[in-house]
Amino acid sequence: MTNPIIPRVGIATDAHQIEAGKPCWIACLLFEGVDGCEGHSDGDVIAHAIVDALLSASGLGDLGSFVGVGRPEYDGVSGTQLLKEVRELLESRGFVIGNVAAQLVGQTPKFGPRREEAQQVISDIIGAPCSLSATTTDHMGFTGRSEGRASVATAVVWKV
């Protein structure tokens, strides 16, 4: 009898404060005319939450242990690069990415018109289906006051 393939699920959140004048990267897409998020990297909350969820699902740590803020080679790193590197890491450890899902929480940018484009971009990077959504918090909390953005993500992987 062979061992069944058992899916592993990871969940993660990411949040960043909005920084006036910084480019706005969300789900590996640049949103023109919208202030971006502060951070050691590009501030892409969706990409970061997905990376964290993939690391969680595979048992390989979290975003902080993966890149860490003390590593200068990751200063300003893009969400695209982080997703590529975590995919390579998972594959090198014998994991396959099943799918990911993430939700943007914030007042801006208007995500709906670019949702399908973002899903395709991330899917192409990770080699697996990606589902994305967005919501506001009806002007409650730091995301509702447009002080920051957040994302929640889940990932399914399995060991081959």
From Swiss-Prot:
InterPro entries: MECDP_synthase, MECDP_synthase_CS, MECDP_synthase_sf. Pathway: Isoprenoid biosynthesis; isopentenyl diphosphate biosynthesis via DXP pathway; isopentenyl diphosphate from 1-deoxy-D-xylulose 5-phosphate: step 4/6. A divalent metal cation binds at residues 14, 16, 48. Its EC number is 4.6.1.12. One of its GO terms (biological process) is terpenoid biosynthetic process. 4-CDP-2-C-methyl-D-erythritol 2-phosphate binds at residues 14-16, 40-41, 62-64, 135-138, 142, 145. The keyword Metal-binding applies. The record marks 40, 136 as: Transition state stabilizer. Gene3D superfamilies: 2-C-methyl-D-erythritol 2,4-cyclodiphosphate synthase. The keyword Lipid metabolism does not apply. Keywords: Isoprene biosynthesis, Lyase, Metal-binding. Binds 1 divalent metal cation per subunit. It comes from the Bacteria. Its cofactor is a divalent metal cation. It catalyses: 4-CDP-2-C-methyl-D-erythritol 2-phosphate = 2-C-methyl-D-erythritol 2,4-cyclic diphosphate + CMP. It is an enzyme of class 4 (lyase). GO terms for molecular function: 2-C-methyl-D-erythritol 2,4-cyclodiphosphate synthase activity; metal ion binding. Belongs to the IspF family. Involved in the biosynthesis of isopentenyl diphosphate (IPP) and dimethylallyl diphosphate (DMAPP), two major building blocks of isoprenoid compounds. Catalyzes the conversion of 4-diphosphocytidyl-2-C-methyl-D-erythritol 2-phosphate (CDP-ME2P) to 2-C-methyl-D-erythritol 2,4-cyclodiphosphate (ME-CPP) with a corresponding release of cytidine 5-monophosphate (CMP). Homotrimer. This is 2-C-methyl-D-erythritol 2,4-cyclodiphosphate synthase. It comes from Corynebacterium glutamicum (strain R).
